[in-house]
């Protein structure tokens, strides 16, 4: 058995009365062992056939009265066994029960004395456990007959004439049970009961009274429950008690029991005899016999119950205390005896309760003026200081009696002194090391003290005194800081702040046997709690810091009450929410927020701030847990007061504390900006953001901020609150993570608020109104802040906010407001943050592109009106495009290929949506950024990423295509975009160069102007050596005008011939697959054609070392330099115009032979000579044609596969429609051919060709021309179309690799160096280039050339002759006259037509 059980029994048994009749009372032991284990005597098994059932509600006697007796077998025994068994056996029918009871009574008439004794014993055992079935129980009619037998037998004599002790004893025992039984005694007639009591009094007053009989009859008087029969005999009973003089312990106990019974039945009559029983009671309280002391204690305790504040009793007791016994006051004698009991006998439990009984009898009025009160206090002081924990617990319980009598005070001064006295033993126990049982007993006393002080109608001054003296000094400073008592302390606070409590305060509650529980405490006045918020919140703050996780709280279960060690987070949250509701209830009826409520809000917010930043009191506390609890506490406060109270900006922050603004002063007089409580709390939480707590703070911040959306505030107020959340974080550079966190939540909630506002306005049938200027201003400020401080991962949330903002403006303001309210402000925002992280800016710029300005406006405005709408906001549009241009210029510096590709793709999609009237204007604004993209020499990752190559190529081709389809004229393009065109021609990307040449031929091929920039002319002139390009400008050709005029007629004839050839080609076996409706497969990347679908080009075998090259050899130094240049990479020369050949080289290192057909020439087919035909520069109009050797010609004749040279075109799926091309039958071998000559051999041949001089013999020249004519094959090309139209290409032919690698852009010649002959030769060169490109109509000349018969002589002879003639012409070209040169040109055109007709 634990000590807690012993404490409870020791404190409660003194308050219990004897519940069953007993010949000897059972009291408390003087030691813990005796109080824990008590002797109990049961009836003999021989006397009772059953051990008896459970104790009934009215009690059982603890010991049998009679000794064991042997049953007589000769006498018929009534069957009472069936009533003493289990519950099933007790369900005998009423008839059987009545017959059995009747048989027992009949036996009393006929049996002998010994049989009656046994019958009485059996009936006693039966009636003790029997519960009658009212109101028709079969026993009730037989009670009178049984009483008659008892009346005769309890006074019968034996044969010698003396009283028969055994029979009398059994009869008295049975009679005591009948009069004690709560149900049976009420069915005994009062007259019969009075006869029994008078008969007992006669025995007690008679001369033949013995000690045994006296004890039996006194026990009957103490057990009876017949008040109607006792009332006339009350004084007589008291006299008998006082006159019995047997020095017996049993008689002393029974006498005190009789006095206690009379006190409970007739307290007034008992109080009148106080003079008789008071000295006896006080003497028994200090008696040497423990049972006597305990019986006296029960009587004293009943005095406080039945004669509470009886003045006569109190005066008599005080008079007896003052009485002099041998020169010493009786009170001093009692004090001395009590000290001995505490110190020597360790019976402090009894002393404490006796001390409390006297206090209750005297009352508070007598105590305050009693001269021996301090002496009396020394007795309980010994109990408080005892080493016995049971004595300490009893002392705490007894102290409640003094609290009950001493707590009521008339003045504040008196109340202060009394509270100081009453709190001292409680704080002493709670503030020092003691056993948990002692501390729990002290907590019970504390609850009783609070209960006694919180009387109805208590004044505010008394309430403040109670709070400071009890709650602060004891509860907060002592009880809350111990894990044994903290849970009960939280229950006290819950009860005090619970506004829903409806408990009724009772004046005599502390006198009751049961202890007061915390839930019975009266609630505090909410108005007083709010007015004293700074004081009442302190214990709550302490409790919050001391709480622990729920799983760490330990629960112990002593005998009667469950004890919890520690305080859980859940319990602390309950205390906080209850306290907040108490504060809020004080202002429920307020129409406008009062000053008191405002101060309470300040107190709450400041306390939450301290809770968040206070140092940990518990060693095992995790700060993460505190952040989560902070969010729950804030939400409970908002729920209690309402969101409007927490969003009112009527507060200031001073020293990190929230202060209410004085309404009498102007807001401008304050240095700080007003702030709302919600923003103050959110800012306090955001300052904790770091790497460890980021996720926890993020979750807490999101939980609190969601209140803005939950309570359905108006849209403008939501925006203002969200702006207040972010504005304090702008100036502090150390709050990087806090900005990221807040940006994520604010951008999300702003988007949700906009979406909700859109839905609400759409659901409203009223006229839709736009946003106010203030709302738009706040939205833009929120966008600006989030763009500046959000993380890359949150850029999507900000982009969503921009999209929602655009939708709202477009919906309520119209399409015309998009540019001034969305595009221009957001562009300004991005301009301001260009110095920040590049990835974010590009993401936001892409989002701005996705705001479908043109597409959305088109839905509302017709296409004709759309350009006008843009013109109205041209400044905003230009501002946006200039931003894109700036980002495009910086794009090459990024090291993220995905970002570069994405930006180029999104910019392409944006440009496609622009009306064609603004394409030229937009490209002009983007020209500075487009130049690096066209050159492609500023992208470090270009060589490693085929994706980036493809993106850049597609982007550049799209720009050229859109510019071609725009409304801009050639002069406008030349004036504004010549640097861009020059960049395209100088690009390191082969596809971009080809697209630029195509664009040149289509736009400027026939456009003559004196304003061609020199750099453009130089670039075109340089490329004309490699490609067939129309050269309309004359800045490098001083004599070009006359030559052009002389050859204009011939050019028109050539153009006609080309048109005729086009018509023939379309119907030929190699017609373009575009006419067949086939699709084109997209290439895998720039410079790398797809293996499944590519353009088939005529291949040419490598020239033999003996037959290729021109006169002269390359110097050794130049040759070494060339060999070293072959080893260098692209990035070493990508910025020089002289390295254009590297961009035209395939990944395998082979030179592509490609053709671009001009719009005026072949649309579906193109013809390329064997090798690249190099047009002579401005000083030499010579045809430089590579011819293969005899061995190579022989290999070709034998069917050796030749090199496949592919032309790759970057496709743009968005701007063009692809058309497939299928190879005609018979050309598969040409497509699948491979290069049989090693690469090293080819390189040597190329170097050899370059090193040869221009003076070669006639035979070699004729053989080269013959080889050229013999190895020309057909070329199949893709067609590029947009909107159903084919994209035409200008024809161009590449030279071999060696000629490209060593060619440089010629420097501009002076006027002295430029002659009329050079200009004339330039004009002839352009004619010849046009002829090779197929731009000259050859329809009129087809018959002349086609009549040449190659079959009459051998092909070798014809080629040899032409080679000799060619070398002869080269040797004497300078001596020819202009007419002769003109004739030579005609011959060459005829030869070209013949070649073309043979190919077709």
Curated annotation (Swiss-Prot):
**Any keyword Nucleotidyltransferase?**
no
- Where in the cell is the protein located? Nucleus; Chromosome, Telomere
Residue ranges of the region described as Disordered:
1-63, 1065-1258
Q: Where is the composition biased (Low complexity)?
A: 22-35
Q: Where is the signal peptide?
A: none
The protein's UniProt keywords, in alphabetical order, are:
Cell cycle, Chromosome, Nucleus, Telomere
Pfam families annotated for this entry? Rif1_N
* Gene Ontology cellular component annotations, sorted alphabetically: chromatin; chromosome, telomeric repeat region; nucleolus; nucleus
Q: Which GO terms describe its biological process?
A: telomere maintenance
**Biased composition, class Polar residues, residue ranges:** 42-52, 1065-1074, 1090-1099, 1177-1230
GO MF annotation terms: chromatin-protein adaptor activity; G-quadruplex DNA binding
Q: Would the keyword Cell cycle turn up in this protein's UniProt record?
A: yes
Q: Where is the composition biased (Basic residues)?
A: 1240-1249
Taking the first listed entry, what is the main subcellular location of this protein, grouped into a coarse class? nucleus
SUPFAM superfamilies xref list:
ARM repeat (SSF48371)
Source taxon at top rank: Eukaryota
Q: Where is the composition biased (Basic and acidic residues)?
A: 1123-1137, 1151-1174
Q: What does this protein do?
A: Negatively regulates telomere length. Appears to play no role in transcriptional silencing of telomeric loci.
Q: Which family does it belong to?
A: Belongs to the RIF1 family.
Subunit composition and interactions: Recruited to telomeres by interaction with taz1. Does not interact with rap1, unlike the orthologous protein of budding yeast.
Matching entries from PANTHER family are given as: TELOMERE-ASSOCIATED PROTEIN RIF1 (PTHR22928:SF3)
Q: What is the protein name for this chain?
A: Telomere length regulator protein rif1
Q: Which organism is it from?
A: Schizosaccharomyces pombe (strain 972 / ATCC 24843)
Please name the gene that encodes this protein: rif1
């Amino acid at each position: 058995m634990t000590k807690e059980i012993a404490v409870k029994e020791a404190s409660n048994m003194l308050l219990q009365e004897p519940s069953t009749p007993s010949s000897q009372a059972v009291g408390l032991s003087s030691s813990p062992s005796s109080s824990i284990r008590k002797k109990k005597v049961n009836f003999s098994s021989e006397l009772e056939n059953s051990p008896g059932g459970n104790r009934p509600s009215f009690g059982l006697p603890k010991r049998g009265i009679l000794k064991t007796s042997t049953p007589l077998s000769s006498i018929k025994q009534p069957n009472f066994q069936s009533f003493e068994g289990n519950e099933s056996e007790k369900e005998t029918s009423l008839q059987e029960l009545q017959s059995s009871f009747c048989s027992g009574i009949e036996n009393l008439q006929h049996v002998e004395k010994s049989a009656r004794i046994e019958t009485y014993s059996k009936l006693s055992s039966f009636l003790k456990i029997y519960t009658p079935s009212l109101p028709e129980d079969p026993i009730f009619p037989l009670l009178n007959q049984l009483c008659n037998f008892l009346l005769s037998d309890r006074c019968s004599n034996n044969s010698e004439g003396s009283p028969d002790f055994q029979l009398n004893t059994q009869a008295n025992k049975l009679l005591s049970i009948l009069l004690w039984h709560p149900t049976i005694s009420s069915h005994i007639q009062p007259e019969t009961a009075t006869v029994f009591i008078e008969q007992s009094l006669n025995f007690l007053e008679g001369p033949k009274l013995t000690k045994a009989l006296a004890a039996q009859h006194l026990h009957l008087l103490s057990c009876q429950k017949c008040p109607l029969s006792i009332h006339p005999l009350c004084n007589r009973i008291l006299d008998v008690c006082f006159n019995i003089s047997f020095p017996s312990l049993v008689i002393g106990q029974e006498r005190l029991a009789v006095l206690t019974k009379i006190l409970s039945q007739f307290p007034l009559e008992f109080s009148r005899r106080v003079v008789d029983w008071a000295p006896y009671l006080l003497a028994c309280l200090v008696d040497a016999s423990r049972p006597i002391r305990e019986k006296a204690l029960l009587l004293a305790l009943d005095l406080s119950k039945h004669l509470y504040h009886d003045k006569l009793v109190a005066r008599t007791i005080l008079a007896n205390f003052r009485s002099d016994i041998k020169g010493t006051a009786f009170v001093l004698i009692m004090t001395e005896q009590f000290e001995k009991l505490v110190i020597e006998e360790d019976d402090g439990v009894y002393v404490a309760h006796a001390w409390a009984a006297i206090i209750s009898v005297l009352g508070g009025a007598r105590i305050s003026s009693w001269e021996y009160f301090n002496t009396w206090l020394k007795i309980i002081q010994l109990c408080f200081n005892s080493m016995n924990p049971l004595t300490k617990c009893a002392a705490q319980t007894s102290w409640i009696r003094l609290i009950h009598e001493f707590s009521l005070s008339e003045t504040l001064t008196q109340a202060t002194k009394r509270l100081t006295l009453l709190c001292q033993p409680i704080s002493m126990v709670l503030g020092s090391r003691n056993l948990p049982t002692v501390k729990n007993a002290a907590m019970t006393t504390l609850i009783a003290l609070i209960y006694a002080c919180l009387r109805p109608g208590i004044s505010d001054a008394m309430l403040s005194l109670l709070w400071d003296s009890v709650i602060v000094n004891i509860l907060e400073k002592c009880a809350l800081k111990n894990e044994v008592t903290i849970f009960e302390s939280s229950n006290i606070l819950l009860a005090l702040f619970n506004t829903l409590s409806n408990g009724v305060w009772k004046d005599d509650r502390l006198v009751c046997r049961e202890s007061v529980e915390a839930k019975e405490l009266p609630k505090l006045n909410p108005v007083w709690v709010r007015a004293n918020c700074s004081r009442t919140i302190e214990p709550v703050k302490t409790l919050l810091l001391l709480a622990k996780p729920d799983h760490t709280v330990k629960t112990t279960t002593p005998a009667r009450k469950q004890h919890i060690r520690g305080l859980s987070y859940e319990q602390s949250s309950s205390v906080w929410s209850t306290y907040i509701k108490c504060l809020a209830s004080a202002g429920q009826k307020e129409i406008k927020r009062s000053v008191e409520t405002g101060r309470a809000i300040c107190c709450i917010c400041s306390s939450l701030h301290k809770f968040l930043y206070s140092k940990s009191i518990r060693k095992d506390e995790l700060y993460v847990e505190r952040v989560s609890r902070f969010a729950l506490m804030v939400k409970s406060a908002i729920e209690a007061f309402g969101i409007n109270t927490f969003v009112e900006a009527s507060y200031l922050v001073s020293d990190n504390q929230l202060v209410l603004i004085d309404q009498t002063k102007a807001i401008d007089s304050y240095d700080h900006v007003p702030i709302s409580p919600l923003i103050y709390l959110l800012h306090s939480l955001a300052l904790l953001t770091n790497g460890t707590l980021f996720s926890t703070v993020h979750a807490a911040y999101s939980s609190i901020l969601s209140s803005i959306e939950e309570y359905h505030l108006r849209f403008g107020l939501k925006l203002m609150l969200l702006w207040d959340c972010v504005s304090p974080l702008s100036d502090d550079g150390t709050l990087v993570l806090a900005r990221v966190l807040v940006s994520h939540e604010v951008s999300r909630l702003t988007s949700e608020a906009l979406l909700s506002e859109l839905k609400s306005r759409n659901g409203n049938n009223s006229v839709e109104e736009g946003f106010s200027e203030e709302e738009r201003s706040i939205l833009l400020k929120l966008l600006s802040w989030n763009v500046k401080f959000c993380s890359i991962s949150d850029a999507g949330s900000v982009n969503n906010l921009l999209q929602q903002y655009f939708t709202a403006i477009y919906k309520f303001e119209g399409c015309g407001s998009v540019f001034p309210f969305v595009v221009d402000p957001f562009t300004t925002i991005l301009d301001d943050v260009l110095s920040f992280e590049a990835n974010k800016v590009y993401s936001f710029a892409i989002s701005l592109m996705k705001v479908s300005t043109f597409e959305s406006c088109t839905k509302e405005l017709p296409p004709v009106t759309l350009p006008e709408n843009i013109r109205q906001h041209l400044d905003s549009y230009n501002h946006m495009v200039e931003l894109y241009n700036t980002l495009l210029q910086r794009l090459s510096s990024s090291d993220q290929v995905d970002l570069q590709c994405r930006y180029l793709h999104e910019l392409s999609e944006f440009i496609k949506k622009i009306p064609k009237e603004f394409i030229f204007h937009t490209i002009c604004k983007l020209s500075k950024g487009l130049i690096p993209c066209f050159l492609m020499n500023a992208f470090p990752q270009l060589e490693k990423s085929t994706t980036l190559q493809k993106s850049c190529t597609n982007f550049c081709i799209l720009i050229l295509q859109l510019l071609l389809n725009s409304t801009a004229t050639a002069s406008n393009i030349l004036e504004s975009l010549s640097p861009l065109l020059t960049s395209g021609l100088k690009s390191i990307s082969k596809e971009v160069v080809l697209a630029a040449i195509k664009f040149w031929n289509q736009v400027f091929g026939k456009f003559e102007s004196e304003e061609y920039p020199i750099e453009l002319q130089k670039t075109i002139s340089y490329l004309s050596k490699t490609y067939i390009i129309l050269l309309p400008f004359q800045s490098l050709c001083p004599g070009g005008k006359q030559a052009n005029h002389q050859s204009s007629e011939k050019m028109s004839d050539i153009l006609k011939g080309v048109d005729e050839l086009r018509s023939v080609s379309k119907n030929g076996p190699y017609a373009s697959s575009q006419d067949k409706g086939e699709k084109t497969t997209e290439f895998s990347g720039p410079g790398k054609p797809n293996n499944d679908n590519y353009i088939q080009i005529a291949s040419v075998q490598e020239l033999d070392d003996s037959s290729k090259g021109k006169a002269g050899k390359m110097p050794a130094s130049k040759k070494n330099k060339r060999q070293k240049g072959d080893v260098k990479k692209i990035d070493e020369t990508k910025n020089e115009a002289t390295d254009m050949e590297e961009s035209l080289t395939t990944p395998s290192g082979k030179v592509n032979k490609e053709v671009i057909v001009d719009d005026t020439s072949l649309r579906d087919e193109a013809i390329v000579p064997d090798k690249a035909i190099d047009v002579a520069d401005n000083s030499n109009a010579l045809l430089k044609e590579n011819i293969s050797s005899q061995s190579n010609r022989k290999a070709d004749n034998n069917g050796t596969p030749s090199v496949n040279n592919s032309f790759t075109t970057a496709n743009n799926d968005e701007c063009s429609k692809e058309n497939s091309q299928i190879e005609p039958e018979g050309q598969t071998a040409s497509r699948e051919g491979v290069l049989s000559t090693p690469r090293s051999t080819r390189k040597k041949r190329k170097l050899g060709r370059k090193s040869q001089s221009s003076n070669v013999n006639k035979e070699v020249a004729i053989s080269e021309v013959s080889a050229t004519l013999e190895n020309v094959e057909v070329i199949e090309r893709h067609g590029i179309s947009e909107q159903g139209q084919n994209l035409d290409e200008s024809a161009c032919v590449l030279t071999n690799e060696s000629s490209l690698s060593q060619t440089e852009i010629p420097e501009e010649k002076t006027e002295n160096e430029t002659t009329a002959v050079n200009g004339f030769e330039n004009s002839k060169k352009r004619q010849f280039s046009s002829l090779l490109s197929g731009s000259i109509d050859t329809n009129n000349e087809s018959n002349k050339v086609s009549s040449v018969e190659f079959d009459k002589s051998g092909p070798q002879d014809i080629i040899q002759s032409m080679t000799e003639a060619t070398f002869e012409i080269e040797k004497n070209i300078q001596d020819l006259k202009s007419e002769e040169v003109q004739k030579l040109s005609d011959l060459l055109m005829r030869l070209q037509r013949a070649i073309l007709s043979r190919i077709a």
